[in-house]
């Protein structure tokens, strides 16, 4: 570069014996450089001149002396920091203001440290332990009770009930039948294996049956219609000499008048009203 070329690219003033700044292979006097190229400080809104330290974070700029925590005002130069809603905070202020608190010890969970989340609450990893054995649960399966969280082995040892059918632990829900506990998915009809969880059912010798299977296997049959007589819905029936009828089927075999609550005659296992049965050789 010759002496003739040693001038400010912007104002053309000679730079001989003066401070200057080289930018993109061009020379600028300090005054022109600061006026044209300086960034403006986010804090004080003044230009960051060439003789000042320019600190940059996410395309925002600060003087070195302005780069401070917005809460405690301590310098953040060469120190770790975090941003919250575009505010710069030192790690201590960020932790106090923004970090989660441990559900167990109530202390701050520091940024960058591992935390456990369960049912909307947070724990230090070392605080998230089984209520019984005090061992860290981590990401292992757990069962929660009002008294705390338990690892599966401790829960089974201390609290578990066992299914009467599969003999495995019932961890939630379940059905009680004949003083025994069952998984919902194990409570099935002893005949057809139909799920009885949301169904009406009947029992025989402490075994559950759906209504259809019970009626087919055990229910008495109506002499008149041959259909099962089930007491599940409170249906009324008539019993006479080891024979049963639905109330609506207990009618005269000749004129079909209802015989419920009335006198009747029988002949060859048929029933008749007294009028129709008169003159017949009845069984009674």
Curated annotation (Swiss-Prot):
Zn finger intervals (C4-type): 8-32
Gene Ontology biological process terms, A to Z: positive regulation of transcription by RNA polymerase II
Function: May be involved in the regulation of spermatogenesis. Stimulates CREM transcriptional activity in a phosphorylation-independent manner.
SUPFAM superfamilies for the chain: Glucocorticoid receptor-like (DNA-binding domain)
Molecular functions (GO terms): transcription coactivator activity; zinc ion binding
Organism name: Macaca fascicularis
Principal subcellular localisation of the protein: nucleus
Lineage: Eukaryota, Metazoa, Chordata, Craniata, Vertebrata
Highest taxon above the source species: Eukaryota
Name listed for the protein in its UniProt record: Four and a half LIM domains protein 5
Cystine connections: none
Subunit structure: Interacts with CREM (via the third LIM domain). Interacts (via second LIM domain) with SPAG8.
Keyword Nucleus: yes
């Amino acid at each position: 570069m010759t002496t003739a070329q040693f001038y400010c690219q912007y104002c053309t003033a000679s730079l001989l014996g003066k401070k200057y700044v080289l930018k993109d292979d061009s020379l600028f006097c300090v005054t022109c450089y600061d006026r044209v190229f300086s960034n403006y400080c986010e804090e004080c809104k003044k230009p960051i001149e060439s003789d000042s330290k320019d600190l940059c974070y996410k395309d925002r700029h600060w003087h070195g002396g302005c780069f401070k925590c917005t809460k405690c005002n301590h310098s953040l130069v060469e120190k770790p920091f975090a941003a919250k809603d575009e505010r710069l905070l030192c790690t201590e202020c960020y932790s106090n203001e923004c970090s989660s608190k441990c559900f167990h010890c109530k202390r701050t969970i520091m940024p960058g440290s591992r935390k456990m989340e369960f049912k909307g609450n947070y724990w230090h990893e070392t605080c998230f332990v089984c209520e019984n054995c005090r061992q860290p649960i981590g990401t292992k399966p757990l069962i929660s009770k009002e008294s705390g969280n338990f690892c599966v082995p401790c829960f089974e040892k201390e609290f578990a009930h066992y299914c009467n059918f599969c003999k495995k632990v019932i961890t939630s829900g379940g059905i009680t039948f004949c003083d025994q506990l069952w998984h919902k998915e194990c409570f099935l009809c002893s005949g057809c294996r139909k799920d009885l969880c949301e169904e009406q059912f009947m029992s025989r010798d402490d075994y559950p049956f759906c209504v259809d299977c019970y009626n087919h296997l055990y229910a008495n049959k109506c002499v008149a219609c041959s259909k099962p007589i089930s007491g599940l819905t409170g249906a009324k029936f008539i019993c006479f000499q080891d024979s049963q009828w639905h109330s609506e089927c207990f009618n005269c075999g000749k004129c079909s008048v209802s015989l419920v609550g009335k006198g009747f005659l029988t002949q060859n296992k048929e029933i008749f009203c007294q009028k129709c049965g008169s003159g017949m050789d009845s069984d009674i």
